[in-house]
């Protein structure tokens, strides 16, 4: 209870931070008594404060959900003592990533939440989770090595890792050099964001984890990669040399991801593919390189964080209520669990882009920005975005048809369920539905936390005007380099970096 209350208070504090950053400008903190660019600078501008606020909503809802579910069922096999502190460590890493004003501390933030994610992914130590965890660790280590290599290239080229000052000095380098370094960052962040062709690891690892773990991973971890790409694109590599490449990546990410989704029988795996697909929309906005495109990307990220997390929490409810997340084993949920059906249908339609939900509004913002760009590649992306939205809706309605509307007796394996609900420790043994323990027993807190997140995601529809206004201002301030650089460097862009003795004098 104390942890949930603390997480709830964080939501309020970060709402205040958005107001402060929006009305009073960028907020900076110089850590350890050293000013930028030598010291560690924490930066809260409109973009980072928006991401912090949305992440706090997700972290609060998932913690509430986790504490409410089988964590209090008295099961000694559930590693509760490991989950909660590791979850807090992951939260710290995500927050540090959003606030970092230099590339090295961005790297540190990534490493902190990745270490926590290794533990969370393999909780319960089932063979399937350990196998998926090994692959996840290997991919994450490769991403971290590429990130560190890119960071070293920046320092070797411009003598600083402070993003504001690095952006100034990058302008003096040849275009080819800047493009090569930025391409290295795209690979590093692309692995974390799961963009094509660096996405194959995600659908193989996320579905194996517990639902609460998958929910927070899907909602936040990939978006940290997207945020990092926005940040370095808008502050360090401002020339737009690789925008056309990013457009192609965005198109392929959308199409390949959604094609994978419509072929799935497991709901978790299907959701994992839709997660990959919709990262493509955010890359679309970044690649346009305009204020309208970036605003659309930020708006869509806010929408997607809340909607995708709520969908994974609903899958957890389905698993506990019906004993499976396999479509070939599901049916009749609309009649046996109407509340779960409603909690699924609203975010599913939202993700599919049905008007007037925020998913539709975010896509319209991106399509309008693409039309303003006017290039043939932008028009191809617009077509890809529309097709992806339609196929996403098809995939979501396929789950609705088979899992909620169909009679369970008509399902190919409708009588096969998990022997008991899986909380954190994986339990993969199956029994006939009549022999299952705890049939349909879902704690109220799991419903309430999921409903809270569904309500939060739906509220974007009604608050679309104010939210799009602040994302517009966030995009404008991100594109106006003088504002960010002045706030971080304290109007001293020529401050020394390598010669610390001269700096001390």
Name each model feature, range by range:
Residues 25-94:
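Hydrophobic alpha-helical transmembrane segments in multi-pass integral membrane proteins
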Residues 13-22, 148-155, 351-355, 460, ...:
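C-terminal TM-helix exit segments that contain a strictly Trp-centered aromatic cap at the helix terminus
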Residues 327, 334-339, 396-505:
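Cytoplasmic/organellar membrane-interface segments at the starts of transmembrane helices
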Residues 2-8, 12:
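Single conserved hydrophobic/aromatic residue that forms the stacking wall/gate
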Residues 61-74, 87, 91-104, 117-364, ...:
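Hydrophobic transmembrane alpha-helices and their helix-loop junctions in integral membrane proteins
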